[in-house]
Structures are given as structure tokens and as C-alpha cells.
Amino acid sequence: MRTTYMAKPNEVERKWYVVDAAGKTLGRLASEVAALLRGKHKPTFTPHVDCGDHVIVINADKVELTGKKLTKKLYYRHSLYPGGLKVRTALEMRTNYPEQMIERAVRGMLPKGSLGRQMFKKLHVYRGSEHPHQAQKPEVYELRG
């Protein structure tokens, strides 16, 4: 009888990928990055083990949004005090906090739980084209979309 292969946490080999967000649509970029972080691109993917790779996203400030989302899409956060709801448009987020915009989109596509939080720690987002991870020798990953 054959048994299904289950990856073990200490057997997982992690690679580093660089993804250029310049000119890419936010949601399409986030879904592919989330798949890389989960390890869905590997034949050894196991749902209950973090077998994903590290992903470096550069040029976060050049990510695109379709339609009127730059002015219409709103990002909410709350200070947990009465009347503490803060609202920012996507345009404000892209100009002032582009890293948070991509991180929020990717986090929403990862599992909700301790495994998802562990996967999210392997995401590294940078505003410009420079990043401090040259020592890891990251491969350039071309997005499909």
C-alpha cells in the first residue's frame, strides 16, 4: 500500500524569491505571493506544515489598482477606544504606507491561525528597488499575470 507523502518541518528547504511589484495589480500580486509563502508551488506541499519560501517584494510604491479603487477603496483600523475608527484611502496608503498595503492584501490570503502567522513572517516588503537580503542570493520570480 502506498501512503501520501507528508513533509516534516525539519525537512523543508526554503528558497528566497524576489518579486517586482512595479506595474502589477495588487490582488494578482498578493495571490501569487501568498501561494509562494504557503508552498503551494512545491510538489511536497503539506497543508498542516509551513513549507513555503521567503518572498521579497520590491517597488511596493509602484503597485497598481484597477478602476477607481485608488480613490474609492478604504482601509480601516481602530484604536480600540470609543470613536477611534481611522480611515485611509488606497491613494494615501500607496503614497505613505505602500508596504502595509501589500502586507494587508497578502495576510488576508493566508490561513487564519498560528500557521498563517508563521508564513506571514517570511514576507519582506520594501518601498524601493533595494533590499538588504542580497546575502541570501534570492532568485527573481516572474509573476504569471
UniProtKB/Swiss-Prot annotation:
The UniProt entry's GO biological process terms, in alphabetical order, are:
negative regulation of translation; translation
Keywords per UniProt: Ribonucleoprotein, Ribosomal protein
Pfam families found in the cross-reference section: Ribosomal_L13
Q: Tell me the protein family, please.
A: Belongs to the universal ribosomal protein uL13 family.
Query: To which species is this protein native?
Result: Geobacillus kaustophilus (strain HTA426)
UniProt lists the gene as: rplM
Subunit annotation: Part of the 50S ribosomal subunit.
Q: Does the keyword Protein transport apply?
A: no
Quote the protein name from its UniProt record.
Large ribosomal subunit protein uL13
CDD domains named in the record? Ribosomal_L13
Under HAMAP family, the record lists: Ribosomal_uL13
- List the record's Gene Ontology CC terms alphabetically: cytosolic large ribosomal subunit
- Give the molecular function GO annotations: mRNA binding; structural constituent of ribosome
Function of this protein?
A: This protein is one of the early assembly proteins of the 50S ribosomal subunit, although it is not seen to bind rRNA by itself. It is important during the early stages of 50S assembly.
